[in-house]
């Protein structure tokens, strides 16, 4: 039976849509503390202000991250959520679980916590909502010793790396995202669990430009699969698509009256760089102009495939609004080989290069993208030891002045004044 009146929350149960309110009420029948979370959220809706205290450091021994402190500022009114800490558990690569593992994890959370979960957080972790301070250490012991699972990242550290399904299920993946994600997760355990950065830092691994983990928009360091040779074309299948014998988009739009497939309107005219055209019944591509956006491949997957020389692009600096607003990542390295054969050493070298610089010059609570913005891209790529490329140009220059670095000027900027006066006597 409900412990609190929640008329505002009850409105969220109306209609045909899933409702977190209904979910919490169902869980409250098993764990009465959940009635208090509904009561506090109702009060927050009524007062139009959160009733979680700001901050609060709590954790498990030896770890600086993985637990997000939550304390109620009205504990006498809602004692069940006086402590209601969030636990982040590192998800397996690509979020593959056995039902046995999920049942064991849920049983553990019912034992030590509220039983409420969020599968998954936007970074990727398994989010376990609601644990009292005194239950954290017993939960952590059982999680690590019985289930052999670990906490994820929180705070100013490396957040839990995340990846798409990669080559386990997707034929477009240009590198093994699961192996890369798992290897770097294990390689950087200290950085995940012991905050040492100016602010959070996120890796995300997408196998192709479809970017199913939104790495370009949500990660400080995005590794996005690509290729550097030509798109592979099966001209016979192109003819079949044009004739309507193969459904476009892998049949994803079946059931609607979309009319006959129009390769000109649906593929060629939508190419962002206009690098495609038809010659008779053959599709032609100027691969030197192709941006590897994946659109044509998505529409005609049986006719087009990524090139055979595969790797990844590295983009850096994406973030949600913090100081300077949301921003997409900037392309830093157009192509790099990503392989477990060398234990991803070339990727690790780039990561540690930027960390060394960012930890030195980054301000407190400043994402690496904001540091890049503050110092300017020319300074950043110089620090990274890279040459500028056209993709780094945001807009055409708007002033007539050209800055020359000292080393770019023959003889530098230093001049002998006495020698100058001899040659230019008054």
Kindly label every feature range from the protein language model.
Residues 319-362:
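A hydrophobic, small-residue-rich beta->alpha segment in the mid-to-C-terminal subdomain
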């Amino acid at each position: 039976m409900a412990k609190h009146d929640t008329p505002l929350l009850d409105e969220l149960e109306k209609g045909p849509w899933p409702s977190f309110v209904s979910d919490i009420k169902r869980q409250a029948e098993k764990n009465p503390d959940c009635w208090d979370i509904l009561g506090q959220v109702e009060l927050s809706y009524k007062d139009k202000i959160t009733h979680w205290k700001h901050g609060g450091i709590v954790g498990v021994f030896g770890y600086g991250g993985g637990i997000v402190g939550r304390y109620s500022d009205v504990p006498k009114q809602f004692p069940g959520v006086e402590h209601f800490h969030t636990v982040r558990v590192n998800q397996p690569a690509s979020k593959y679980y056995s039902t046995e593992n999920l049942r064991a994890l849920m049983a553990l959370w019912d034992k030590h916590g509220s039983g409420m979960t969020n599968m998954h957080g936007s970074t990727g972790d398994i989010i376990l909502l609601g644990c009292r301070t005194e239950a954290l250490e017993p939960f952590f012991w059982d999680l690590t010793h019985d289930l052999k699972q670990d906490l994820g990242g929180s705070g100013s550290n490396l957040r839990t790396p995340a990846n798409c399904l990669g080559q386990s299920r997707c034929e477009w993946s240009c590198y093994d995202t699961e192996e890369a994600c798992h290897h770097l997760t294990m390689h950087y355990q200290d950085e995940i669990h012991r905050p040492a950065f100016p602010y959070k830092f996120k890796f995300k691994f997408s196998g192709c430009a479809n970017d199913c983990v939104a790495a370009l928009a949500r990660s400080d360091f995005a590794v996005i699969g690509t290729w550097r040779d030509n798109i592979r074309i099966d001209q016979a299948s192109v003819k079949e698509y044009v004739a309507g014998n193969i459904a476009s988009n892998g049949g994803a739009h079946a059931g609607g009256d979309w009319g006959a497939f129009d390769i000109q309107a649906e593929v060629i005219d939508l190419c962002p760089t206009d690098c495609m055209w038809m010659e008779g019944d053959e599709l032609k591509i100027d691969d030197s102009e192709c941006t590897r956006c994946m659109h044509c491949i998505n529409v005609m997957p049986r006719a087009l495939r990524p090139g055979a020389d595969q790797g990844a692009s590295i983009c850096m600096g994406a973030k949600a609004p913090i100081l300077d607003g949301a921003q997409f990542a900037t392309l830093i390295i157009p192509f790099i080989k990503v392989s477990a054969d060398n234990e991803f050493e070339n990727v690790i070298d780039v990561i540690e290069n930027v960390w060394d610089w960012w930890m030195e010059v980054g301000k407190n609570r400043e994402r690496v993208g904001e540091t890049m913005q503050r110092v300017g891209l020319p300074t950043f790529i110089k620090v990274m030891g890279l040459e500028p490329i056209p993709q780094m140009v945001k807009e055409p220059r708007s002033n007539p002045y050209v800055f020359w670095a000292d080393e770019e000027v023959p003889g530098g900027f230093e001049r002998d004044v006495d020698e100058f006066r001899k040659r230019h006597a008054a």
